[in-house]
Regions:
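Short amphipathic alpha-helical segments
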Residues: 45-46, 71-72, 101-102, 120-124, ...
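Generic beta-strand/beta-sheet core signal
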Residues: 34, 44, 54-63, 90-92, ...
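N-terminal Rossmann NAD(P)-binding subdomain characteristic of aldehyde/semialdehyde dehydrogenases
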Residues: 1-44, 48, 82, 87
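Short alpha-helical
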Residues: 39, 65-68, 94-96, 115-116, ...
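PLP-dependent aminotransferase-like
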Residues: 46-97
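A structured beta-alpha segment of the ubiquitous adenosine-cofactor-binding alpha/beta core
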Residues: 20-21, 88-110
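ALDH superfamily catalytic-core signature
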Residues: 76-83, 108, 116-197
């Protein structure tokens, strides 16, 4: 109900030069959500919920490695009142995601996965659509951790190992760069080597 109120209400905003501006919300239309294998429920639910909350029709394409979870998540949305016409599920490998991003009715894509795949989707959207299509892509990060002389070495060691190696390092929040103050470098490196054995 709150979403409907937001969508049906225009807000008048004062402009910096005295003009009047109107802010209104409207759906994009048909949104494609492509989710990864490593957080198959959390990311998929977030993508679907956001797209539906904004009033969009949603096509879901989970990773081919998490098809059953994608099916179960979509089924739960349907069981709780989301019409099949508003949320559809497509199962298959990456060629399906590639084909779906070429469909002209797609007005937005939420994608979590590799940079190369995001670039392919972006290229499809640019080449095959007459208008600009929204692309929300989460493709990874270069995450940095700094350890200085105030660090508790045991805690830092645990945090570094978990951040770098949980999920085999295959997540966007994984540690990629570690900066260590000279004063603790040798001790921390020794502890890290010991933990990795």
């Amino acid at each position: 109900e709150e979403i409907i109120k937001i969508h049906n209400r225009d807000s008048v905003l004062d402009g910096p030069t005295g003009e009047i501006n109107t802010l209104s919300y409207s759906e994009k239309g048909h949104f494609l959500c492509i989710s990864p294998w490593n957080f198959p429920v959390a990311i998929l639910i977030g993508q679907i919920s956001a797209a539906l909350a904004c009033g969009n029709r949603v096509t879901v394409k989970p990773s081919e490695h998490t098809s059953i979870l994608g099916y179960l998540v979509t089924k739960k949305f349907h069981e709780h009142g989301v019409p099949i016409s508003a949320l559809e599920l497509i199962l298959g490998d990456g060629t399906y995601g590639d084909a779906l991003s070429n469909i002209e009715s797609i007005k937005g894509v939420a994608f979590t996965g590799s940079l190369n795949t995001a670039k392919k989707i972006q290229s499809n959207l640019i080449i095959n659509h007459k208008e600009i299509v929204t692309l929300i892509a989460e493709t990874g990060g270069v995450n940095v951790m700094m350890a200085d002389s105030s660090a508790l070495l045991e805690q830092a060691t645990d945090d570094i190992i978990r951040s770098a190696f949980d999920s085999s390092g295959q997540r966007c929040s994984a540690l990629r760069v570690l900066c260590i103050q000279d004063d603790i470098y040798d001790d921390l490196l020794t502890m890290l080597k010991g933990s990795m054995r």
